[in-house]
Amino acid sequence: MEGDDFTPEGGKLPEFKLDARQAQGFISFFKKLPQDPRAVRLFDRRDYYTAHGENATFIARTYYHTMSALRQLGSSSDGILSASVSKAMFETIARNILLERTDCTLELYEGSGSNWRLTKSGTPGNIGSFEDILFANNDMEDSPVIVALFPACRESQLYVGLSFLDMTNRKLGLAEFPEDSRFTNVESALVALGCKECLLPADCEKSIDLNPLQDVISNCNVLLTEKKKADFKSRDLAQDLGRIIRGSVEPVRDLLSQFDYALGPLGALLSYAELLADDTNYGNYTIEKYNLNCYMRLDSAAVRALNIAEGKTDVNKNFSLFGLMNRTCTVGMGKRLLNRWLKQPLLDVNEINNRLDMVQAFVEDPELRQGLRQQLKRISDIDRLTHSLRKKSANLQPVVKLYQSCSRIPYIKGILQQYNGQFSTLIRSKFLEPLEEWMAKNRFGRFSSLVETAIDLAQLENGEYRISPLYSSDLGVLKDELSVVENHINNLHVDTASDLDLSVDKQLKLEKGSLGHVFRMSKKEEQKVRKKLTGSYLIIETRKDGVKFTNSKLKNLSDQYQALFGEYTSCQKKVVGDVVRVSGTFSEVFENFAAVLSELDVLQSFADLATSCPVPYVRPDITASDEGDIVLLGSRHPCLEAQDGVNFIPNDCTLVRGKSWFQIITGPNMGGKSTFIRQVGVNVLMAQVGSFVPCDQASISVRDCIFARVGAGDCQLHGVSTFMQEMLETASILKGASDKSLIIIDELGRGTSTYDGFGLAWAICEHLMEVTRAPTLFATHFHELTALAHRNDDEHQHISDIGVANYHVGAHIDPLSRKLTMLYKVEPGACDQSFGIHVAEFANFPEAVVALAKSKAAELEDFSTTPTFSDDLKDEVGSKRKRVFSPDDITRGAARARLFLEEFAALPMDEMDGSKILEMATKMKADLQKDAADNPWLQQFF
C-alpha cells in the first residue's frame, strides 16, 4: 500500500493488514461480484472495514473529502483502488446512506481471502439488518416505509394500485385510486406515508407515460427500485398473509376482495422484504385499507415551502417545523409520531378539537405538564424494544428496559388522576382508561413478576444482564465464585488507592468495560503519582477524561472474572431464550402502551412549545371547510421567530369569503412577501395537526390540501430549468386544487420574459378565481395584476363574488437620501412600483451600476426618478410607473392569451408527431396574431 496517511478528525485511517496472497484472493473474489451501480459494498475485517473500486472513490470523495484516502490494493496491472473505514466512520456512512440519501443501498460482507459472503443488506426503506448500528447512539425519528405502485389504464382512465410496508410498526396497507397525468395523488400518498423507497414494475403498459411518475418519486426524495412485472403477482396472497397477519384470515380475504390493482404491489412487497422467510414475523403484522382522503394532502413542494422536515443544511433544529415542535419529545416513538402527524394533518373538526383540548389542558396546568415530563424522560423507545424481542438474537437488555419503562405506569396514572380541569373526561378516556386496563388485568403485574423472578436486577448497577442464580444450582455456584473475585477486586482497589495516596472512588475509580476491570484517575492526579505508576503499573489509555491503568494483580483478577462471566452467560443461555420468548407474548400490549405514551409525549411537546416562546401561542378556532374564514391576527412564522437575534414583526391575515378570499400581494423584494404567505400556510398546518399557533388570535376553516409554489430552484440533474419546475408545480395546483384547498404562490413567472410571465400570471390568477375558487395568497412583482381586484362588471361577476383584495408589504423611501427602509408590515392596497433598483442600493451595489440601471429603466419603462406619492399610500409605497396599456386592453388581451394557452394545452401531443404539432402551433399563433391587430397589449408579444 502506498501514499500518505490521511487523518480524518485527527486520527489515522486504519491500516490494511493483508499480505500479497490474501490481497490477490480478495481481488479475484471482488471482480466476480455482479455489477450494481447503487450498491455501496463494505467488507468487515474485524477491526476495520474496507471499500473497493468505485465504492472506494465514492467514500473518499463523499466522506473523507480527499482522494489521498485511496490506496492501491494489489499490483498496478490488476489491482483495485481501496479505502479503509474505521468502525466510527462505518456508522456515519451507514446512517447517511440509509437515513439521509435516497440513491444508494448498503451491503456488508464477512469472510477472508477469496471466501466472502453477504451478511447484511439494507435500503432506505428496509434498514432492519443495520438497526442496531444506526440507532445504537441515536433515536429513530422516522419509520422508513416501502411502497409498491402498479399503474394501469381502464377505459382511458389511469388508475394506480398502491401497497405500503412499515417494518418498524409491522403494518401493511393497500389503496387504489384514479390518477391524473401528473400523479398528484401518488405524490400526496408518498409524502403522507413518509416513504423512503418505491417499487415499480420495469415493464408497464406502453400507453402509460412513467416519466412524470418517476419525477414525483425523485421530488419526494424516494429511492426508485424497478422490479420485473412478474414480481407483481397476487397468487396465494391470502394464504401468505394468513401466516403473518394477526387474527383470522377471513377479514384479510374480505379486505383483498375490495381491490383490483393493489394486490400485485402487495405481493411484490412480501417478496422484496422476504417477510415470509422470517418466522418472527408470523402473526405479528396488521393490514389496513389506506384512505387518501383522511388527511390534508401535501405535495413535495409544500413540504419544502413550509419547512416541515429537517434539512441537511439546517444550522439548528429550529429551521424546520419538525425540529421546532420536537423540543421536548423524549424518545424515538414520540418523535416518529410527530413526524407522521406533521405529514398527516387532520380534516375532521372534532378530532382536531380533541387534540387542541388536550394541549389546552397541559398548557393551563404547569404542574401536570412538568410531572408527566419527568416520568416520560425515564421511558425507553418501547416500539423498538418490542421489535428487538422478536429477533432470534434477542437478549435480556430489551426485557429489562421494558420492565423499567413499565414501572413508570403507576406514577403516570397517579399524575393524570390528579387533573380535575375542564377536559378531565377526555384525559380519562384517552390516557387514564388504557393505563388502568393494563393495571386492572394484571398485565403489568404478570410481566413484572416474570422479570423480578428471572433476572438478577441487582447486577444492573454493574451494567450486566444476568438470569437470577436462584434458577439453577450451577448458576448459584458461578454467582458465588464471581462474588469472591469481585471482593478481591474491590479489596485491590482499596489497596491501590492506599499505595498511591489517593482516595477511593473520589480520586481513584474502578471501572469495568471493554478493557475489563481498570483503574482510572484524572490527568492532574496522574502527574502527582507518575513515579509510582512507572514502576508497578501499566498505563492502558490516556484520554481527556483521565488515565486508565492496571497492574498484574488486577489483570489476573479481571481475566478470572471475564472467564467466570462467560461461563455464567453460557449456562443461562436457555433460560434467557425462555424469558425473551415469554416476554414477547406481551408484545401487543406493549404496542398499545407505546401508542398511548407516544401521543402523550407529542401533546406535551405541543404544550411546552406554546408556553415557552417569548410570545405564547394561542388556541385556534376551527370550522368546517365550507364554513368560516381564515383569520390570523398578529400571526408570526414559528421557525423564524425562534432564531437567535430575530425580532419578528407580526402581521394580520384575513382571508374572508366574498371580500379577501383571493389576495394579491405586491411590494419590494426582501420586504417580507414570501415569509408572510409561508407563515399563513404553516399556521394552518399547525392548527390541523392539533397544535396552538403563533398568533394573537386565530380562526381557521379546515383545508383539505395546501399547495405551494414558492422559490422554485433549478433541477439540472433532472434536465429541468427553474421556469419549467415552476410551471410543473403550477400545473399540479391547477389540476389538483379545490375550493377547500389553500394556495400560496410566490413570484410566478419570474423565470421567463416579463411579458410571457405576466400573461401566464394573469391567466393563472383568472383560473384560480373563476374555477378553483380556493383561498389564495398570490405574491407577485407584476403590479398590473392588482387590476384584477377592480373588475366588477357583469362579465366578471364570478370573480368579484370570490372576493379579490390587494395587499402590499410596506417600505419607506427617505425623500432626501432616497434610502429604502423595509417595514415588513402587510397593509391593504396595491403597490405599483418595483423597488428592484432600491434593493440593489440596499445590497451596496457600486454607484455606477445603480446609476446605469436607473438610466436604462427610464429608457425602457418611462421610469420616473422623482417620487410621486398617492394619497392613500403616501411615502410608504413610492413613485409610480406610467401605464402604457388601458385596463380594457389588458383584460381583453389576457383573456385571448389565456384561450390560446388552453387550446395549446388541450392538444393531444402524445398522439401527434413533431411535424403535426408544429403545424397546429403555427396555425394557432397566426390566429392569435390576427386577433392582436386591434389590441396593443397583445401586439407586444409579436
Swiss-Prot record:
The lineage of its organism: Eukaryota, Viridiplantae, Streptophyta, Embryophyta, Tracheophyta. It holds the Pfam family MutS_I. Belongs to the DNA mismatch repair MutS family. GO terms for cellular component: MutSalpha complex; nucleus. Coiled coil: none annotated. ATP binds at G667, P668, N669, M670, G671, G672, K673, S674. Keywords: ATP-binding, DNA damage, DNA repair, DNA-binding, Nucleotide-binding, Nucleus. It comes from Zea mays (Maize). This is DNA mismatch repair protein MSH2.
